[in-house]
């Protein structure tokens, strides 16, 4: 009887572990709110703003025999639908365009990394690092 109880406990914990690993521990690819920074060399300020970006988990695979078969392309969380918004940097000298444009995620999907439109690297240690003093946060959603 104890062996049966142990087996049942092992099964329940195993199923719970699988269920938990697919839940909130790995959020799927989706738009999330993020604070970004914008500045230009000629303008004296840095503006932080909140917008929606694509982030989250995409299923990836690696071949067991990479020597025989070519590598599998890894999919990343990237924009499916987007629009562009702009912020105006105050205090820019005449002749310097004060506008900075950025994408706003409307929907996301897992797809190939296109370096022309996607930052395929990992998380940044200092995503809001600016050379100029920051102004208060602006919200763009």
Curated annotation (Swiss-Prot):
Modified residues (Blocked amino end (Ser)): 21
Keywords assigned: Disulfide bond, Glycoprotein, Hormone, Secreted, Signal
UniProt cross-references to InterPro entries, sorted A to Z: Cystine-knot_cytokine, Glyco_hormone_CN, Gonadotropin_bsu, Gonadotropin_bsu_CS
Domain of life: Eukaryota
GO biological process per UniProt: estradiol secretion; G protein-coupled receptor signaling pathway
Predominant localisation class: secreted
Subcellular localization(s) per the UniProt record: Secreted
Entry-listed glycosylation sites: 33
Disulfide bonds: 29-77, 43-92, 46-130, 54-108, 58-110, 113-120
GO MF term list: hormone activity
GO cellular component, as recorded: cytoplasm; extracellular space
Signal peptide range: 1-20
Keyword Repressor: no
Coiled-coil parts of chain: none
Segments traversing the membrane: none
Assembly description: Heterodimer of a common alpha chain and a unique beta chain which confers biological specificity to thyrotropin, lutropin, follitropin and gonadotropin. The beta chain can also be formed by LH beta 1, LH beta 2 and LH beta 3.
Family to which the UniProt record says this protein belongs: Belongs to the glycoprotein hormones subunit beta family.
Reported function: Promotes spermatogenesis and ovulation by stimulating the testes and ovaries to synthesize steroids. The LH alpha 3/LH beta 3 heterodimer was shown to have potent renotropic and weak gonadotropic activity.
Protein name: Lutropin subunit beta
Taxonomic source organism: Ovis aries
């Amino acid at each position: 009887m104890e062996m049966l109880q142990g087996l049942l406990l092992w099964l329940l914990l195993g199923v719970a572990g699988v269920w938990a690993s697919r839940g909130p521990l790995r959020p799927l690819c989706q738009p999330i709110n993020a604070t970004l920074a914008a500045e230009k060399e000629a303008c004296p300020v840095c503006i932080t703003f909140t917008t929606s970006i694509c982030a989250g988990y995409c299923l990836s695979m690696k071949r067991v025999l990479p020597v025989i078969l070519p590598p599998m392309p890894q999919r990343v969380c990237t924009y499916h639908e987007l629009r562009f918004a702009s912020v105006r940097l105050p205090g820019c000298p005449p002749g310097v365009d004060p506008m900075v444009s950025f994408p706003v995620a409307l929907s996301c999907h897992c797809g190939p990394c296109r370096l022309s439109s996607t930052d395929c690297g990992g998380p940044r240690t200092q995503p809001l690092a600016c050379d100029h003093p920051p102004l208060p946060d602006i919200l763009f959603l």
